[in-house]
Regions:
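Mixed-charge, glycine-accented linear interaction segment located at domain edges/termini
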Residues: 525-528, 532-551
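Generic long, charged, amphipathic alpha-helical segments
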Residues: 493-525
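Short beta-alpha connecting loops at secondary-structure transitions
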Residues: 209-211, 267-275, 287-299, 371-377, ...
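A mid-to-C-terminal "edge-of-domain" accessory segment
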Residues: 2-39, 293-473, 509-514
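Short, small-residue-enriched loops and turns at beta-alpha junctions
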Residues: 40, 44, 74-78, 132-134, ...
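Alpha/beta enzyme core
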Residues: 7, 33, 47-68, 84-90, ...
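Catalytic alpha/beta core domains of metabolic enzymes, predominantly
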Residues: 216-351
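N-terminal capping/small domains of soluble enzymes
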Residues: 1-107, 371, 376-379, 383, ...
């Protein structure tokens, strides 16, 4: 690509080395979660949500378990203001949920904000102003001192109006464009704001460190966060919050590393909706913790429902590959993957049902409301014996011999390849029946009689081939062997009986049985058949005839 020289790094490393966070292995407890779907997410929609959609979305967030929910920028529009008043006046805010409202550090906007939250049981008032080099120089054309004064004046007005307004308020400050701000200067501004608020153990302040635009790799942000955490005043009474965006695709990594670096709180959205490439996806963050055995304190056990409400309200589509939530994230089309999953599921069932270590599946799909049959093993032209066999076994109770699974896998692959489509379980089952079960052309058996004689079995078989019926007598070590010998004798066939397997299809005295028979042809290849009948002897004979017809 051309013109690479016009770009330069726009981030700043802390003045001292801040890498203690690298000593931690994983995030071991859930942060305070704050959904910003109804503000940051909503403002990024082509068609913002209506009042009714916002109320429905708010109820979804409460259902998931969010205890802090940003509900709007009251001064931005009448819809935003009305929505906030609706929540308050209709008592839609649960006792254990705190709403959050956003305001710029401008007097008339701050005053409008406090009007909107009057009477709220409790609310976080989030004030911000931009502090980055680019914003100072290009947008506001102000010095560091002037930018700091904007922050302090805004913080002062928040404190004054909180004392004058009905309600219980907590304060939050963001140095917007934190990642493009010199860390020392961001610290100076935040500490000046904290000096105004003087947070206490009973009324902590929130300092939010937004990745307004991603400029760096995640480890840089983590170092910036660690620097702030170690140098903020009143640290024991300050909640350090993160608000990552996803411009470089690192929103989740920024958040996880930022938590390792000492942050206490995350602001984000469901499925990463937000300006440009979006905010950090809280679903992914929470489920990452869950997959490591850490309680995220959010409930995504009915992910299909969450996706449905999100898509209806936001008008956005959850991507099919979106981690943990997409329609295809548990799907295995590859034959080797399917085989490993099927074996892993059997191993878990037999060895350790209490733990989840199944290959290729980072979590149990049923933990998020998905199921194995429809969501995991999916059959197309890339699939193989493992997936086809797993579907036939788990959904239809057919436990095929290994080599027969292979033959059935090739049959399914051929159909999918020819039709250029995925095969659904019922199509696979029907393919099995039409290919391997009770096939009576060109050979069929009309009648069989057995007699035990001289330690062996003698049989009299009446069979039909191309409309001609003959009766043949033969002996064998068992019934199936005797019938095999009779058919060889009648039609001068050459084959060897190499595989026989049977099992009940249902657990009852009147259930049908299925038998599988594999025969080896003179060229060494195998042909397969299955027979289904309440009489296992008849089922095995039908399986043999089908295998012969499949030669």
């Amino acid at each position: 690509m051309k013109n690479v020289t016009k770009y330069k790094r726009q981030y700043f490393m802390p003045p001292v080395k801040c890498m203690k966070w690298t000593e931690k292995e994983y995030v071991d407890k859930a942060p305070i979660w704050c959904s910003v779907d109804l503000r940051d997410g909503n403002q990024a929609l082509v068609i913002p949500m209506s009042l009714e959609q916002k109320v429905e979305f708010f109820k979804l967030l409460v259902e998931i378990g969010f205890k802090e929910i940003e509900v709007g920028f009251p001064a931005a529009s009448e819809t935003e203001y009305t929505f906030i008043r609706t929540l308050i006046e209709q008592n839609l805010i649960p006792d254990d949920v705190t709403i959050q409202v956003l305001t710029q550090a401008r007097e008339h906007i701050i005053r409008k904000t406090f009007e909107a939250v009057k009477g709220a049981p409790k609310a976080i008032v989030h004030v911000y102003n931009s502090t980055s080099v680019a914003q100072r120089e290009q947008v506001f054309k102000k010095s560091k001192e002037e930018i700091l004064k904007i922050a302090v004046d805004g913080a002062t007005l928040l404190k004054e109006l909180a004392d004058q307004t009905e309600g219980n308020f907590q304060f939050e400050y963001s140095p917007e464009s934190f990642t493009g701000t010199e860390p020392e200067y961001a610290l100076e501004v935040c500490n000046a704001v904290l000096d105004v608020w003087k947070p206490t153990a009973d009324n902590k302040a929130i300092i939010n460190l937004p990745v307004t635009v991603q400029h760096s790799m995640p480890h840089v942000y983590a170092s910036q966060v660690e620097y702030m955490c170690e140098n903020l005043k009143y640290r024991e009474n300050v909640i350090v919050s993160l608000h990552p965006h996803n411009d470089r695709g690192c929103g989740v990594a920024d958040s996880e590393m930022g938590l390792l670096a000492g942050a206490d709180r995350i602001e984000g959205t469901l499925f990463g909706n937000g300006e440009r490439t979006g905010n950090v996806d809280i679903v992914t963050l929470a489920m990452n913790m869950f997959s490591q055995g850490v309680d995220s304190e959010l409930d995504f056990s009915n992910m299909p429902h969450v996706c449905e409400v999100y898509e209806e309200c936001a008008g956005m589509k959850v991507d099919e590959r979106s981690p943990y939530s997409g329609a295809l994230v548990f799907a295995a089309f590859s034959g080797s993957h399917q085989d490993a999953i099927a074996k892993g599921m059997h191993w878990r069932e037999e060895k350790d049902p209490s733990r989840w270590t199944v290959p290729y599946l980072p979590i149990d799909p049923t933990d998020v409301g998905r199921n194995y049959d429809a969501d995991v093993i999916r059959i197309n032209s890339q699939s193989g014996k493992g997936g086809v066999g797993y579907i036939l076994e788990t959904k239809y109770g057919l436990n095929l011999p290994p080599k027969m699974r292979e033959a059935m896998g090739y049959a399914a692959k051929a159909v999918s390849d020819h039709s250029h489509k995925e095969l659904h379980p019922d199509e696979i089952f029907n393919l099995f029946k039409s290919t391997f079960e009770n096939i009576v052309e060109p050979y069929s058996i009309n009648e069989v009689h057995f007699q035990q004689k001289d330690g062996g079995i003698t049989t009299q078989v009446t069979s039909t081939f191309n409309g001609k019926t003959i009766t043949t007598e033969a002996t064998g070590n068992g019934r199936l062997d005797a019938v095999s010998n009779a058919l060889r004798k009648a039609y001068e066939m050459k084959f060897t009986l190499v595989t026989y397997q049977e099992h009940a299809l249902e657990k009852s005295t009147s259930s049908k049985a299925i038998a599988y028979v594999g025969i080896q042809k003179p060229d060494g290849t195998l042909a397969w058949g299955a027979g289904v009948n309440p009489d296992i002897i008849r089922a095995s004979i039908d399986a043999l005839v089908t295998a012969i017809n499949n030669r």
